[in-house]
């Protein structure tokens, strides 16, 4: 066997013989690698932890990693029941990645109280998305100088009332296009049409009317977003030394889709930059700045007085960055909400309540959606929030990396231990969001979709003094038991915008369409913990006669 291996190596390197010295050197390298990895700080730490999903078998951790492809949620739930409920952290293996240290639910206040210099979130995001390879230097810059996200936080959230009409107009146009106006049932692909509706409607706010109605931009911005996430996984699986060599080939499609989007955006951006410059020079210039994120990015770029920021390629990259963070999560959340609502045994009752609420609120606001009107859609809000709990997209939350050179500590050594758990730098930590969302101690009947779970209290006290004193729980309310948007100071800043758009979508859908009741046997697809609707699932829809 050994001679056969040597012969293959000889053939590979083009040598006729391998000297004993080379063989000895290779042997020493292998042994040294084994010893160093076996006795490093990280190895000692992981060897001291309890593991979930690891069985007594040959190559136990390697085989456990492979099982995480389709079974990581069950492994997480097993660890939650076996360790978290005893206030003990546990290790969770992941395919092609370092393991996670999963902290118990009780550690969330501790985790949130720690400074960014002790545990860091940005490193995790960079590690997951591999911006250096997947989005290139432009993508790296828009992450380091996140003008687009600052605008989403400051401008969009503040100007939501002014954006509702434009969004609703685009919502009507895209629903009519992709779901049709036929009053007889016809089949549509749920995931595909939801994605296209969301992409067009959100880009009315992001990129403006002209770009959001360009089929090329809509298609290739969608493919770009999908490619960044998918190709990041492939790049992460490469040995670090091979990434600079192979990543450019893997991520070629990202650059192709970005360049097609640039060709669509280029004339629009150039025209806007010219008009904005003229308006800044002469307030009487006859041009009204559009009300959208693209325009606010251009204005902020002028304010920074940096020519690089006004490069159309840079501005297009910022639009694609917004699409990446917003489109996928929003369209999957909406597809899950539709699935959960229409496959529920109580769907008829839920729909009666939702339609009654929409009609009442719309009538009270003069037949137009307003910011205050959307805030009054407590049943619509609850339905989406419950779907985000019941069909949560991710399996972990509050992901951080320990960056303090001295490490950090958590009270997570078990209920019978008074000594804290010391975690060395470089270890990735998280909390088991999926298991928390399914904990019967936190949510009664957690495996049942209850559309009005979060609106019952507000409905009960509507219009009374008690309503004023009751804490208002909505989609955007993050808690230690509702974690789709994270929690604490790093909770998703775009959730206020996302919540309003999802409420408008669901309100529009239930008012204007009937969806044929779905089978309770329809299951979501789960891949390495991420839940997605079945990409091939078709549903029957028809326009309501109203």
Swiss-Prot record:
Q: Name one GO molecular function term.
A: monooxygenase activity
Tell me which InterPro entries the record gives: Cyt_P450, Cyt_P450_CS, Cyt_P450_E_grp-IV, Cyt_P450_sf
User: Which segments cross the bilayer?
Assistant: 17-37
Xref: CDD domains: CYP503A1-like (cd11041)
Tell me which UniProt keywords the record has, alphabetically: Glycoprotein, Heme, Iron, Membrane, Metal-binding, Monooxygenase, Oxidoreductase, Transmembrane, Transmembrane helix
List, alphabetically, the PROSITE patterns matched: CYTOCHROME_P450
A GO CC term attached to the entry: membrane
> Which sites carry carbohydrate?
189, 413, 416
One Pfam family hit: p450
Q: Which cofactor does it need?
A: heme
Q: Where does heme bind?
A: 492
- Gene3D superfamilies attached to this UniProt entry: Cytochrome P450
One GO BP annotation is: secondary metabolic process
Biotechnological utility:
Pneumocandin B0 is the starting molecule for the first semisynthetic echinocandin antifungal drug, caspofungin acetate. Pneumocandin B0 is a minor fermentation product, and its industrial production was achieved by a combination of extensive mutation and medium optimization. Inactivation of three of gloP/GLP450-1, gloO/GLP450-2, and gloM/GLOXY1 generates 13 different pneumocandin analogs that lack one, two, three, or four hydroxyl groups on 4R,5R-dihydroxy-ornithine and 3S,4S-dihydroxy-homotyrosine of the parent hexapeptide.
Q: Describe the family membership recorded for this protein in Swiss-Prot or TrEMBL.
A: Belongs to the cytochrome P450 family.
The protein depicted here goes by the name: Cytochrome P450 monooxygenase gloP
């Amino acid at each position: 066997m050994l001679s056969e291996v040597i012969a293959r190596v000889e053939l590979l390197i083009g040598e006729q013989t391998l000297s004993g010295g080379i063989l000895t050197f290779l042997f020493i390298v292998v042994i040294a690698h084994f010893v160093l990895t076996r006795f490093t700080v990280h190895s000692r730490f992981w060897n001291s932890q309890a593991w979930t999903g690891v069985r007594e078998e040959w190559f136990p951790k390697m085989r456990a990693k492979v099982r995480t492809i389709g079974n990581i949620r069950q492994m997480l739930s097993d660890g939650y029941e076996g360790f978290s409920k005893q206030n003990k952290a546990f290790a969770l293996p992941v395919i092609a990645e370092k393991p996670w240290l999963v902290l118990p639910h009780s550690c969330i206040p501790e985790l949130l109280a720690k400074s960014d210099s002790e545990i860091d979130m940005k490193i995790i995001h960079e590690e997951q998305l591999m911006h250096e390879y997947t989005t290139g230097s432009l993508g790296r810059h828009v992450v380091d100088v996140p003008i687009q996200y600052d605008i989403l936080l400051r401008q969009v959230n503040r100007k939501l009332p002014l954006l509702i009409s434009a969004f609703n107009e685009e919502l009507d146009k895209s629903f009519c296009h992709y779901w049709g106006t036929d009053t007889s049932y016809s089949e549509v692909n749920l995931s595909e049409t939801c994605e296209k509706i969301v992409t067009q409607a959100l880009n009315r706010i992001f990129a403006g009317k002209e770009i959001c109605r360009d089929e090329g931009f809509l298609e290739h911005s969608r493919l770009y977003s999908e490619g960044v996430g998918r190709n990041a996984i492939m790049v992460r699986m490469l040995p670090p030394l091979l990434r600079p060599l192979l990543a450019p080939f893997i991520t070629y499609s990202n650059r192709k889709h970005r360049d097609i989007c640039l060709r669509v955006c280029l004339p629009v951006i150039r025209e806007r930059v010219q008009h904005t410059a003229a308006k800044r020079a002469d307030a009487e210039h006859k041009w009204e700045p559009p009300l959208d994120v693209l325009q606010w990015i251009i204005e902020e770029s002028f304010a920074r007085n940096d020519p690089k920021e006004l490069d159309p390629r840079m501005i297009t990259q910022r639009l694609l960055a917004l699409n990446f963070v917003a489109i996928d999560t929003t369209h999957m959340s909406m597809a899950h909400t539709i699935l959960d609502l229409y496959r529920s045994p109580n769907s008829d009752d839920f729909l009666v309540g939702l339609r009654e609420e929409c009609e009442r609120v719309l009538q009270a606001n003069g037949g137009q959606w307003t910011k205050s009107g959307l805030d009054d859609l407590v049943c619509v809000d609850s339905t989406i929030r419950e779907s985000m709990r019941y069909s949560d997209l991710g399996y972990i939350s509050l992901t951080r990396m320990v960056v303090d050179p001295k490490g950090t500590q958590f009270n997570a050594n078990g209920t019978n231990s008074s000594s804290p758990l010391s975690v060395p730098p470089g270890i990735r930590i998280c909390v088991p969001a999926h298991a928390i969302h399914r904990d019967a101690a936190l949510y009664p009947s957690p495996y049942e979709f209850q559309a009005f779970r979060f609106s019952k209290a507000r409905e009960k006290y509507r219009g009374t003094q008690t309503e004023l004193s009751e804490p208002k729980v909505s989609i955007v309310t993050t808690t230690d038991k509702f974690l789709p948007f994270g929690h604490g100071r790093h909770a998703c800043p775009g959730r206020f915008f996302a919540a309003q758009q999802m409420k408008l979508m669901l309100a529009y859908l239930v008012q204007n369409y009937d969806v044929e009741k779905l089978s309770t046997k329809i299951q979501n697809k789960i891949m390495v913990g991420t839940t997605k609707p079945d990409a091939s699932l078709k549903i029957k829809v028809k326009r309501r006669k109203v």
